[in-house]
Amino acid sequence: MHIRSLTVKALAAVALGTTLIGAQAQVPEGKVGINYSRCDKNFEGWGLHTWKNPGIPLPGVEWQKPMPPTGTSDFGVYWHTDLAEYGSSQTVNYIIHKGDSKEQGGKDMKFSGKENKEIWVNSGDRKIYFTLEEAKKGREEKPCQ
């Protein structure tokens, strides 16, 4: 059964144009990834508002119409965006939200796409994690209620 499950995930990854590492999607070259986990596993309506400096949303992204997730993984959902969209600074600005409900304390968040190709965010936690292992440890320290 486990082999069948992995085969199905691998076929889904091929269809989506992504590569799975374990059960995580590898970020394609030239893109950055934001991974998001919720304790309730309910991602319906949650999206990504992302912009480049000085506050110019990426094409097609509006507050009322956030970017839907690119895909799912064992961690949760993820978004892949083109790093070039963020301009020469490659500063990735974002808010994960559902309507006016915002993650990470409702703050505008950012990270350097030059230094970090991928980040992980746990619901109810303000911290940005730079590895999956850090995110899992963060969840252990702040378990789901």
Locate the predicted segments by residue:
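Conserved structural position at the C-terminal beta-strand
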Residues: 96-98
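Aromatic-rich carbohydrate-binding modules that target alpha-glucans
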Residues: 40-87, 100-109
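Exposed beta-strand face motif in extracellular beta-rich ectodomains
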Residues: 90-94
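Hydrophobic core
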Residues: 14-22
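Structured interaction patches on ligand/partner-binding surfaces of diverse proteins
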Residues: 100-139
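Sec/Tat signal peptide C-region and signal peptidase I cleavage site
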Residues: 9, 21-26
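Bacterial N-terminal signal peptides that target proteins for export
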Residues: 1-11
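Structural beta-strand segments of beta-rich domains
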Residues: 30-34
